[in-house]
């Protein structure tokens, strides 16, 4: 929403698609492409559903590339916020993932609450009913008490808090193992904390893995964690990992950010 080039290119493609496929309505997934869709739709006046997967303008404030020197020059979360409000007012209906997100949106934008539908995150049935157990993962942790974290490991995800609790945890759980499946640019700092606390034997950094392996990690775990820090984004959205854990019957420890607190 800083430069119009993407909108111009994509709107032309979308307009061609609408015209040649007899489209009757449009469903826009998240804010990134919304401007292109609305721009293309001027010629057709179709009903548009704007599906907001998250509070993107808010979470962008925490992105490393947005906070870099070039990012601060080229990317404006404020302009994204203005765009979000503009297209929410233009949309025929809006989808958000929590009641808290609906409440926040209606409180910020003068729109009828009947236009805002809550449709929560979920996992596909095949994730928990049609997976193949990877015995290598299961055997690797068969003798450990596994605390599992799935997903992005950036600072706002709260793993630093978990790492700093390990010296106390291992006093009572001798076979404890924190297994982190995911990564981010913050990993070097997490690795430094592990080294400083001398807890390397209790932490496995697995990096990103194919989602097909997630059920095996979950089945190997005693507890799944979601230690998110509180902010306007985390307080109004759900982490997918919560539903992945629960779908396979894995107990969950979560932080008290509002959305997680209400869910669990």
Task: Label each residue range with its predicted role.
Residues 157, 206, 212-217, 224-246, ...:
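Nucleotide-sugar-dependent
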Residues 150, 177-191, 207-208:
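Glycosyltransferase donor-sugar binding loop
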Residues 188-215, 223:
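Nucleotide-activated donor-binding/catalytic signature segment of Leloir-type glycosyltransferases, i.e.
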Residues 8-19, 35, 39-43, 56-58, ...:
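Membrane-proximal helix-turn-helix segments that form the acceptor-binding/catalytic region
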Residues 130-146, 171:
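Nucleotide-sugar donor-binding and catalytic loop/hinge architecture
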Residues 1, 49-82, 112, 126, ...:
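Acceptor-binding helix/loop patch of EC 2.4 sugar-transfer enzymes
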Residues 100, 122:
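Carbohydrate-associated surface elements
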Residues 95, 123, 139-166, 179:
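Conserved donor-binding/catalytic core segment of Leloir-type glycosyltransferases
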